[in-house]
Amino acid sequence: MPKKYRVEITEAAEADIAEIWEYIAQDKPDAATAFILRLEEQIGTLEHFPERCPFVPENELLGTAYRHLLYGNYRTIFKIVESRVIIMRVLHGAQLLDTEMLEG
């Protein structure tokens, strides 16, 4: 049986998700809700095989070991710590990651 991880979402990531909803909802509230539900489903899949997701390209520059899950135009930045998957941020794919985004 595959190992199951506990997925934890930081306050910063929760705020990112709320911001994404607000941005999409300006034009299409129903689409915003549907997108967020699907995004949360995708995040939930990290309970199993989070290693399937690639490392973020910024790791070399930042000296970190973060991975990302891509969905739509967004990437969910996370790290694996023992049996936990910690969701650090949910960012637009064009946005580069820096250490200030990961503090907190």
Map each language-model feature to its residues.
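Enriched for short, Lys/Arg-rich terminal
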Residues: Y71-G104
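Basic, Lys/Arg-enriched alpha-helical interface segments
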Residues: M1-T64
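Short, low-complexity, polar/charged sequence segments that are solvent-exposed and flexible
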Residues: Q26-P29, A65, M88-V90, L97
